[in-house]
Amino acid sequence: MTTSGALFPSLVPGSRGASNKYLVEFRAGKMSLKGTTVTPDKRKGLVYIQQTDDSLIHFCWKDRTSGNVEDDLIIFPDDCEFKRVPQCPSGRVYVLKFKAGSKRLFFWMQEPKTDQDEEHCRKVNEYLNNPPMPGALGASGSSGHELSALGGEGGLQSLLGNMSHSQLMQLIGPAGLGGLGGLGALTGPGLASLLGSSGPPGSSSSSSSRSQSAAVTPSSTTSSTRATPAPSAPAAASATSPSPAPSSGNGASTAASPTQPIQLSDLQSILATMNVPAGPAGGQQVDLASVLTPEIMAPILANADVQERLLPYLPSGESLPQTADEIQNTLTSPQFQQALGMFSAALASGQLGPLMCQFGLPAEAVEAANKGDVEAFAKAMQNNAKPEQKEGDTKDKKDEEEDMSLD
């Protein structure tokens, strides 16, 4: 089984936890391809799709008798397509076809009834190409960043509450979005200390989230015959639909002094009391994910100073070198864009004011957050950062003059 890392890895080292509920599941056997002929593997199997804690979508097949998961593929939107094979006489053979390369995986339906075959196929394609927003399972499969995507209770809490310090810094920390033009001030000086983060995040073995999905498919030694699936298993089952996880919030948190580090438990408590509306409150909503496009970020990320500040916060591991190219890959990854879209929607909801106050941000920024005015919030943070930038420039100039006087 082959897996790859992501921008937001599981919080438990070495763990890739997931919800007990699968997004979609149905009984199906595998088929082996030899030349132009496919042969059914008569073992009882289960095809299922699940979203792990790192928000990645996994397409899996397991042996129902042994319980062994033999195929576990990490799929990104537009990687592949699941469709029926019309050449099969029974009409119950489906193929997972990758758009890049010639990789194909064949399966034959083992459900006793055929009436759900097309529905299962539709759901597979929906979840593979339009993964649900983190914490909003059970909502529509749309991959957009509308405020409604925050879904029921716990959507926002699940996203931010499950992030480590370093992950939060990637969203709003001085070494995360810091330096990105006018929006760089979303960070604010000293936010790292407020979050209790004193250094780069710990290492975690991972690989590029943009890499092609891969899996090791066990070889099957069976005689080659035309595709004729074995009879379906007699037992009945139905696909389980995901349901939103209940909110784990425990009420409002006590106000912390701006000089005290804010822990993740404080963030969870604050977010637990929020009521994110199902739609925009009115007016034009600014989506940071649509603002920070690859075209806009490219010249900024070409700046060596910006690269130097961002590199320590990249996921690290043997298969993922910390390079300038990986900065681009990370900031354009689906996971980062999803998180950025949700943060933008939450900010526009007008309910992040108390949280920004906890960060010790300037009054103008807190007021803008209370109003849900993303543009005013960015300007307030930018204006707040200018005096410190001038102070730094003055200090550098003074040091330069001292060096010259020594000469």
Curated annotation (Swiss-Prot):
**Ranges where the Pru domain occurs:** 18-131
Instruction: Name the species this protein comes from.
Output: Homo sapiens
Give the record's GO CC terms.
Answer: cytosol; nucleoplasm; plasma membrane; proteasome complex; proteasome regulatory particle, lid subcomplex
Description of how the protein assembles with itself and partners: Component of the 19S proteasome regulatory particle complex. The 26S proteasome consists of a 20S core particle (CP) and two 19S regulatory subunits (RP). Interacts with the proteasomal scaffolding protein PSMD1. Interacts with deubiquitinase UCHL5; this interaction activates the auto-inhibited UCHL5 by deoligomerizing it. Interacts with UBQLN2 and ubiquitin.
- Give residue numbers for the modification (Phosphotyrosine): Y127
* Positions of the UniProt region annotated as Interaction with UCHL5: 253-407
Region: Disordered, residue numbers: 194-259, 379-407
**Record remark on domains:** The Pru (pleckstrin-like receptor for ubiquitin) domain mediates interactions with PSMD1 and ubiquitin. Preferential binding to the proximal subunit of 'Lys-48'-linked diubiquitin allows UCHL5 access to the distal subunit.
One BP term from GO: proteasome-mediated ubiquitin-dependent protein catabolic process
This chain's protein is named: Proteasomal ubiquitin receptor ADRM1
